[in-house]
């Protein structure tokens, strides 16, 4: 199977979208909705969407694995945003022109400072070595997740840099109907993006862990391919999301042959998210966490150690996993 694309920028919707002046169900205090029309977008058609690989859009926070300090590291998303003065100028410009591409940015003066270790996301257009902000005036980028980081404590809980491993959820290699939680070498994930999900991420739509025993996992983007997706018609996709077990997901991301990623979210179709019973929680999950091969004493409180105590145990669904000290 070919390696699927990584998420380095905002993904366009598979359909042309329109704005409706009614309260959003996705974001509190947003007085409008962005809804899909029945017309496929030019970007989707240009990327040959009909021959793309559809995958589950997972609800978490985006991460990236690349080298830092001479070894593979997990990186957290950090968008560089304009300062107040530049943001005001940008909003006034949009109000008059409504085309963000015509706005002139001074990258060195218009943006808030970021840590020295910050890097811009790949595939970002550049002029004279400076990354160009997206249509929202943001420059997508990454910062490395340091060990014991307070700011990124949930990110750091799913990696161990001494053993160079990550805590990953994906399909069991021999049984597509079974999920597996295992320790994966960070080197195997180099230049991939992943989704961090769990107790303290995005309201925990998958019901993982608890406040007393938080649980977080990484899912490589494109890990959950969708079989038997209906045709790319608005009505068919709406029926699929609303009426079948496989449709109980946040959305779909199509991985196109040219590397382009195209999405549709339940909210684009006027459907709710989160929902009570997700497709991810309909599958059994097995723990594969034998740490004996690592010549290293894992911290007694770390997730890897907790999972090693239930190695080879099988659970009916993800939310049934309760880690105790």
From Swiss-Prot:
Coiled coil: none annotated. GO terms for biological process: hematopoietic progenitor cell differentiation; response to reactive oxygen species; RNA repair. AMPylates itself (auto-AMPylation). Its EC number is 6.5.1.3. Keywords: ATP-binding, Ligase, Nucleotide-binding, RNA repair. InterPro entries: RLIG1. Transmembrane segments: none annotated. It holds the Pfam family RLIG1. The keyword rRNA-binding does not apply. The keyword Ligase applies. Its cofactor is Mg(2+); Mn(2+). One of its GO terms (molecular function) is RNA ligase (ATP) activity. Functions as an RNA ligase, in vitro. The ligation reaction entails three nucleotidyl transfer steps. In the first step, the RNA ligase reacts with ATP in the absence of nucleic acid to form a covalent ligase-AMP intermediate and release pyrophosphate. In step 2, the ligase-AMP binds to the nucleic acid and transfers the adenylate to the 5'-PO4 terminus to form an adenylylated intermediate. In step 3, the RNA ligase directs the attack of the 3'-OH on the 5'-phosphoanhydride linkage, resulting in a repaired 3'-5' phosphodiester and release of AMP. This is RNA ligase 1. It comes from Bos taurus (Bovine).
């Amino acid at each position: 199977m070919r390696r699927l694309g990584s998420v380095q920028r905002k993904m366009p919707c598979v359909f042309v979208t329109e704005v409706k002046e009614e309260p959003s169900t996705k974001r509190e205090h947003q007085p409008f909705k962005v809804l899909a029309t029945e017309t496929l977008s030019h970007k989707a058609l240009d990327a040959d969407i009909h021959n793309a690989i559809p995958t589950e859009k997972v609800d978490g926070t985006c991460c990236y694995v690349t080298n830092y300090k001479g070894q593979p590291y997990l990186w957290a998303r950090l968008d560089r945003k304009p300062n107040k003065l530049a943001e005001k100028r940008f909003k006034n410009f949009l109000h008059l022109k409504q085309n963000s591409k015509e706005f002139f940015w001074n990258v060195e003066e218009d943006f808030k400072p970021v840590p020295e270790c910050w890097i811009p996301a790949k595939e970002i257009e550049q002029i004279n070595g400076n990354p160009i902000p997206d249509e929202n005036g943001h420059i997508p980028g990454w910062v490395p997740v340091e060990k014991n980081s307070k700011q990124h404590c949930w990110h750091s809980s799913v990696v161990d840099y001494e053993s160079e491993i990550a805590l990953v959820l994906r399909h069991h290699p021999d049984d597509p109907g079974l999920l597996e939680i295992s320790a994966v070498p960070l080197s195997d994930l180099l230049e991939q993006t992943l989704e961090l999900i769990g107790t303290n991420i995005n309201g925990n739509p998958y019901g993982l862990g608890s406040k007393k025993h938080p649980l977080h996992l990484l899912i490589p983007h494109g890990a959950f391919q969708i079989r038997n997706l209906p045709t790319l018609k608005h009505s068919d996709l709406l029926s699929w999301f609303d009426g079948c077990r496989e449709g109980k997901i946040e959305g779909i991301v199509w991985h196109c042959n040219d590397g382009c990623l195209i999405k549709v979210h339940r909210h684009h179709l006027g459907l709710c998210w989160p929902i009570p019973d997700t497709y991810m929680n309909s599958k059994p999950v097995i723990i594969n966490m034998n740490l004996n091969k690592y010549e290293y004493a894992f911290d007694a409180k770390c997730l890897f150690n907790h999972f090693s105590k239930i190695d080879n145990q099988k659970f009916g669904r993800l939310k049934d996993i309760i880690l105790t000290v």
